[in-house]
Regions:
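Conserved, structured core segments of small domains
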Residues: 1-91
Length: 91
């Protein structure tokens, strides 16, 4: 199952703890990328957050994975399930 996860930092919670959490994001992402759980990640230009594509086996695995994120308590999440888009001309 693939999910597009958009996360945006809650700037009203800005603190040194939040800054430290953001700095830990690459260490969080690395093992997930190597395991194939995060297949793409992008910065949202002009915003404080990111767009990540996760590939996991279940909704529960996605929830557990997001809960391990260093910014989990500082961000708002939008989660969009993704589906393959077959070519209607050449199915």
């Amino acid at each position: 199952m693939k999910f597009l996860v958009l996360w945006r930092m809650e700037l009203s919670l800005l603190s040194s703890e939040m800054a430290a959490a953001v700095a830990r994001m690459p260490r969080y992402a690395g093992p997930l990328e190597r395991a194939g759980k995060v297949i793409a990640r992008y910065h949202l230009v002009g915003q404080h957050g990111g767009a990540w594509i996760y590939e996991v086996s279940s909704n529960e695995e996605l929830e557990r994975t997001l809960a391990m994120s260093p910014v989990y308590n500082f961000a708002r999440y939008e989660i969009h399930p993704l589906a393959e888009m077959p070519d209607p001309v050449n199915p």
